[in-house]
């Protein structure tokens, strides 16, 4: 049995490969329409599922546009190098940055996610 959070994407395998590289977590399972990052026993898996008619969310949220349903927050030690790595892997930096110790990025499928500096 596994527990997970499912994220919709136009190409689940590609998005799983992005997060696999970003997090250093291998892909545990992949089949047409679904990819799952391997999770240590007892941890929550991240599941990527193909969605017909997928529409990427807009950040920041805007009236009449697809709103983000959820987002990931990842704690990092060195914010600048973590952002540079995410950009090299295919993320983009969001224009709207609401906090100094957090960077909002957009993954290759258009989902916002945050890299949060670990201030101890």
Describe each PLM feature range.
Residues 11-26, 86-88:
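Amphipathic alpha-helical segments
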Residues 1-17, 69-76, 116-120:
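N-terminal beta-strand motif that seeds the catalytic metal site of vicinal oxygen chelate
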Residues 1, 25-71, 83-108, 118-120:
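Vicinal oxygen chelate
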């Amino acid at each position: 049995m596994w527990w997970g959070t499912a994220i919709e994407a136009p190409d689940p395998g590609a998005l799983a490969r992005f997060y696999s590289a970003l997090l250093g977590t291998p892909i545990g399972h992949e089949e047409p329409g679904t990819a799952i990052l391997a999770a240590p026993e007892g941890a929550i898996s991240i599941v990527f599922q193909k969605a017909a008619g997928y529409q990427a969310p807009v950040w920041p949220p805007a009236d009449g546009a697809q709103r983000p349903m959820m987002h990931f927050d990842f704690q990092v030690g060195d914010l600048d190098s973590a952002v540079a790595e995410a950009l090299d892997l295919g993320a983009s930096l969001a224009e709207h940055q609401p906090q100094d110790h957090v960077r909002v990025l957009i993954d290759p499928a258009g989902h916002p996610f945050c890299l949060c500096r670990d201030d101890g």
